Curated annotation (Swiss-Prot):
Mode of membrane association: Peripheral membrane protein
Gene: atpH
Protein's UniProt name: ATP synthase subunit delta
Superkingdom to which the source organism belongs: Bacteria
Chief location category: membrane
Organism field: Ligilactobacillus salivarius (strain UCC118)
Entry-linked HAMAP family: ATP_synth_delta_bact
Keyword Ion transport: yes
Record-linked InterPro entries: ATP_synth_OSCP/delta_N_sf (IPR026015), ATPase_OSCP/dsu (IPR000711)
Subunit relationships: F-type ATPases have 2 components, F(1) - the catalytic core - and F(0) - the membrane proton channel. F(1) has five subunits: alpha(3), beta(3), gamma(1), delta(1), epsilon(1). F(0) has three main subunits: a(1), b(2) and c(10-14). The alpha and beta chains form an alternating ring which encloses part of the gamma chain. F(1) is attached to F(0) by a central stalk formed by the gamma and epsilon chains, while a peripheral stalk is formed by the delta and b chains.
MF (Gene Ontology): proton-transporting ATP synthase activity, rotational mechanism
């Protein structure tokens, strides 16, 4: 039975997280995974190269050796296993799953903050602190997004929470009430 990518990503991410925690290298391994994630994001053609049937296995193995250089034993084993099972293109998803589990473990919430204007660091910190209190997190990592279309106010979105305090939404609510 062939597994879909979502199942692969979930299983490998969970196994890696549990193994890294058991080996007491979770934070260090998390940092190492972030370096690989940067490489994958900065070199999108790497995924295409590694999944292409037109590229020889020898060429792919040379790239694998470069990728494994200076890697931890756990990372080297992961890369070898993904390559051997033809799942190397799932690496970024596996890293994302590890990140999700790590955030859950650390009680960290990632949230998009949409505002009409760019926020200074002080306002970002205040929003992060307030949002952390609301959702019961120790830490909130904010991804600021500027959207002049919301007119004013703020929209906060995390995996399990949405707060829309934008002027645009308030105007829409008033409009609906007036049209009733």
């Amino acid at each position: 039975m062939k597994l879909d990518n979502e199942t692969i990503v979930h299983r490998y991410g969970k196994a890696l997280f549990e193994l890294a925690e058991e080996m007491k290298i979770r934070n260090k391994f998390h940092s190492e995974l972030q370096e690989y994630k940067k490489v994958l994001q900065n070199e999108p053609q790497l995924k295409v190269f590694m999944s292409s049937n037109q590229i020889s296995p020898e060429a792919k193995l040379k790239i694998m050796e470069i990728l494994k250089k200076d890697s931890s034993k756990l990372m080297t084993n992961l890369l070898d296993m993904l390559y051997d099972y033809g799942r190397i293109t799932s690496l970024e998803g596996i890293i994302d799953e590890f990140d999700r589990l790590n955030d859950e473990f650390e009680k960290t919430v990632r949230a998009s903050v949409i505002t009409a204007i760019e926020l200074d660091e002080e306002r970002k910190q205040k929003l992060a602190s307030s949002f952390a209190n609301v959702v019961g997190a120790k830490k909130v990592i904010i991804d600021p997004i500027v959207d002049p279309g919301i007119i004013g106010g703020v929209i906060l979105k995390s995996e399990s929470y949405i707060y829309d305090g934008s002027i645009k939404t308030k105007i829409a609510r008033i409009k609906r009430l007036l049209l009733k």
